[in-house]
């Protein structure tokens, strides 16, 4: 493997706390005490991960009458009772099976209880149990706790299992550099990666966004004999697409001998991510021709981005024939499709027929009515349905108020956003308010919103809204201030210069018009 300048993190965690974990477990103190007492020496023996155990059968039988989680809880409670009575629990198969069940159910609290039941010598001497414990913590978002267990595994170099789990845990948390550091540490420790290592580390690489690192890992996986493994190559396609090299992504895609639905969806998503709709539609057609059904995520992405209404209608028909019209993400995308084409009746019909709705559904239908007051009616329905709006919801309703001149409603909603829903205003919300006041001719209020009420430095969208309002209402003084800030923030945006020229033209200030035009010439902008 090749080396890379990614500093391995220093892992020293004296305690488990909210500052050191991505999630705070209920058994904080138990974990802390457990780690202090659990390990005394090293020396592990391997245990087959697939060794049969009676515990799954026990849980399966109990699941007939109770949920799996209740059955798991019952088994652990029985074992805890036995331990309290001094009955020795030494069967590794039981603990391995319980950890497997906790992992499959993502039952981290139950996993902590199992962790407490494992005898210290068994945890020290059984690589299989330690590895499963690492996987459980890592998969549930406790990568740092998993790393503590991992650091005490003396023979962890005998298998990539625990390494893979920890790499995956960091990658899922967005700690991509930590995941990459572990991968390169594997090479230093002489641990041979397997087909499960590469998809995990490629995900981390895609998060970092480095094609150079990705190419190095590509060479590694070919050297290790996985150059034609569809599972690995699918991850490679995603990595190159996320790192910005869609050509390499397509080259890898074309190399896959037996493409599965993940291969096709990965390439389709990659094209959509890069805005290459024509290429995405070609992949979509090829998928259908090859008998591969695009998943609902891919279908939703295509529907939301398709430019031709004819193509959109054809896709809608295709969706109906496959009975997918009322899949939540697909229905949401159809609302966007029809509303963008001005087909509000069809968009409303789909929304009204939906069996379930999420925030995206409400946002889509509210945004569809951004030019009329009906959007506020949907917002009120959303409130009555106890659906929780988000920042996007308020961008839509505030834009609606600006477009329709509903100043008081806009002010009320802006206040409601933070006071009732706890959503802190962001740049786009302030831009909406400036637009609201500006369109209504309330220039002083618009300017005051920027210089007195904003808790952050105004960006181009905010100053741009103010400059446009100055153009609409012929306010030269504030317009000059807004233009000057925009010239500093966006020195190459000729639209800002053109708006100032129009403001001066309205005011019949010919000399200032020529001065701004000369500024454009000096900066190499078109006039």
Swiss-Prot record:
GO CC annotations, alphabetized: chloroplast
Family statement: Belongs to the PPR family. PCMP-E subfamily.
Compositional bias per record (Basic residues), positions renumbered to this chain: 21-35
MF (Gene Ontology): mRNA binding
Positions of the UniProt region annotated as Disordered: 12-44
GO BP term (any one): RNA splicing
Entry keyword set: Chloroplast, Plastid, Repeat, Transit peptide
Localization: Plastid, Chloroplast
Type E motif: region residues: 462-527
Alphabetical list of SUPFAM superfamilies matching this protein: TPR-like
Disulfide pairings: none
PPR repeat segments: 126-156, 159-193, 194-228, 229-259, 260-294, 295-326, 327-361, 367-389, 390-425, 426-457
Segment annotated as transit peptide: 1-47
Protein name: Pentatricopeptide repeat-containing protein At4g25270, chloroplastic
Domain of life: Eukaryota
Short name of one Pfam family: PPR_long
Gene label: PCMP-E53
Entry annotated with the keyword rRNA-binding: no
């Amino acid at each position: 493997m090749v080396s890379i300048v990614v500093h391995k993190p220093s892992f020293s965690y004296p305690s488990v706390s909210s500052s050191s974990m991505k999630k705070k477990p209920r058994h904080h103190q138990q974990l802390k005490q457990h780690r202090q007492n659990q390990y005394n020496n090293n020396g592990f023996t391997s245990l087959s991960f697939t060794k049969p155990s009676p515990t799954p059968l026990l849980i399966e039988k109990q699941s007939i009458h109770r949920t799996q989680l209740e059955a798991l809880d019952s088994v652990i409670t029985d074992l805890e009772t036995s331990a309290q009575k001094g009955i020795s629990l030494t069967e590794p198969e039981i603990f391995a099976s319980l950890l497997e069940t906790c992992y499959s159910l993502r039952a981290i609290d139950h996993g902590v209880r199992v962790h407490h039941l494992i005898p210290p010598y068994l945890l020290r001497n059984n690589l299989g149990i330690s590895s499963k414990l690492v996987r459980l913590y890592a998969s549930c978002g406790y990568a740092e706790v998993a790393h503590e267990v991992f650091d005490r595994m003396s023979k962890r170099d005998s298998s990539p299992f625990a390494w893979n789990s920890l790499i995956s845990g960091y990658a899922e948390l967005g700690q991509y550099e930590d995941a990459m550091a572990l991968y390169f540490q594997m090479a230093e420790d002489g641990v041979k990666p397997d087909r499960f290592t590469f998809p995990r580390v490629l995900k981390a690489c895609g998060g970092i966004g480095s094609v150079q690192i990705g190419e190095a890992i590509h060479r590694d996986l070919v050297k290790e004999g996985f150059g034609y493994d569809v599972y690995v190559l699918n991850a490679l396609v995603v990595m190159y697409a996320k790192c910005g090299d869609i050509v390499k992504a397509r080259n890898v895609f074309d190399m896959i001998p037996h493409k599965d639905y993940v291969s096709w969806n990965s390439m389709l998503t990659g094209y959509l991510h890069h805005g290459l709709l024509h290429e995405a539609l070609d992949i979509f057609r090829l998928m259908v021709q090859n008998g591969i059904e695009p998943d609902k995520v891919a279908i939703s992405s295509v529907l939301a981005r398709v430019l031709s209404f004819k193509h959109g209608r054809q896709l809608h028909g295709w969706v109906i024939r496959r009975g997918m019209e009322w899949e939540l993400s697909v229905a949401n995308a159809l609302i966007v499709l029809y509303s963008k084409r001005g087909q509000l009746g069809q968009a409303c019909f789909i929304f009204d027929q939906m069996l379930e709705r999420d925030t995206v559904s409400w946002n889509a239908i509210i945004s569809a009515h951004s030019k009329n007051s009906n959007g506020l009616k949907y917002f009120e329905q959303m409130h009555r349905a106890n659906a929780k709006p988000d920042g996007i919801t308020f961008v839509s309703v505030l834009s609606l108020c600006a477009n329709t001149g509903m100043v008081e409603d806009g002010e009320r909603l802006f206040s409601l956003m933070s006071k009732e829903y706890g959503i802190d205003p962001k740049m786009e919300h302030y831009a909406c308010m400036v637009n609201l006041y500006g369109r209504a001719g309330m220039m002083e209020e618009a300017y005051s919103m920027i210089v007195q009420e904003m808790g952050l430095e105004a960006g181009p969208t905010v100053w741009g809204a103010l400059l446009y309002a100055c153009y609409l209402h012929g306010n030269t003084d504030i317009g000059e201030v807004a233009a000057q800030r925009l010239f500093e923030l966006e020195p190459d945006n000729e639209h800002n210069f053109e708006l100032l020229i129009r403001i001066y033209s309205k005011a019949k200030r010919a000399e200032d018009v020529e001065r701004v035009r000369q500024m454009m010439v000096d900066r190499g902008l078109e006039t």
